[in-house]
């Protein structure tokens, strides 16, 4: 796209070294990679490959030891802790394997939480949260508590919460790890829709090849380096896969 030639995520020879007493662990060894606005990228690799460290740096939860990380053109190393927290809240939506919902709080209130930190007023908070829940197919469930929702529905609330501040990027770390295969594909259908219809950049960490298959691009880490990076030639469309899968009763869509 013409005006979007600058990458949203830019890693320039990024190293990350952890000092564990007398031992130094080289988690990232000179990573250079660009992710452009509107991409849907799966990050793969074995445990200890560097993929989690990469995600932590992308999400401004950690900083490079050497090298540069630019997020939307901003050099993250130059930011204060407070500025980093603001960026995490406004520019990045996080989705994890564990849903991290507040149990005594409704789906709507859980979704609203990031807007409270962003300083939005009540009415706008409600509107944004309702819109986000609608996008993930949870209209009519706004006042349900997490205990009244299935695992897949709870993960949808977590995605709505990640969307509510209209972030530039969604970072999803093993988001289907706790879900059965049918529900996992439903979640991937939401990510594909958000990516295609709303242009949201999605970076997804997974160790499952059948989940990475829904991304447009796959980056494979090994020993702190990128071993493979390229378009996903055999990309699956979740809406085509869903009808072929058996459903579990509690995950079936309600009759219209």
Enumerate the predicted regions with their spans.
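Pre-NBD coupling/linker segments of ABC/ABC-like ATPases
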Residues: 1-3
């Amino acid at each position: 796209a013409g005006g979007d030639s600058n990458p949203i995520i830019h890693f320039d020879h990024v190293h990350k070294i952890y000092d564990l007493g007398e031992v130094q662990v080289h988690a990232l060894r000179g990573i250079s990679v660009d992710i452009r606005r509107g991409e849907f990228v799966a990050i793969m690799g074995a445990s200890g490959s560097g993929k989690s460290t990469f995600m932590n740096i992308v999400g401004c939860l950690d900083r490079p030891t050497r090298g540069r990380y630019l997020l939307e053109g901003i050099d993250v190393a130059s930011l204060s802790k407070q500025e980093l927290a603001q960026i995490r809240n406004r520019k990045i939506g996080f989705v994890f394997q564990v849903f991290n919902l507040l149990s005594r709080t409704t789906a709507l209130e859980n979704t609203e939480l990031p807007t409270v930190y962003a300083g939005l007023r009540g009415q706008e908070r409600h509107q944004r949260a309702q819109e986000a829940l609608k996008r993930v197919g949870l209209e009519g469930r706004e006042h349900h508590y997490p205990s009244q929702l299935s695992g897949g529905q709870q993960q949808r609330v977590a995605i709505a919460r990640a969307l509510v501040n209209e972030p530039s990027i969604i970072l999803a770390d093993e988001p289907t790890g706790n879900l059965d295969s049918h529900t996992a594909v439903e979640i991937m259908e939401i990510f594909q829709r958000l990516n295609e219809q709303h242009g949201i950049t999605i970076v997804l960490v997974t160790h499952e090849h059948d989940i990475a298959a829904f991304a447009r691009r796959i980056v494979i880490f090994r020993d702190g380096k990128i071993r493979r990076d390229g378009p996903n030639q055999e990309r699956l469309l979740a809406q085509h896969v869903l009808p072929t899968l058996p459903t579990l009763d509690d995950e079936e869509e309600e009759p219209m």
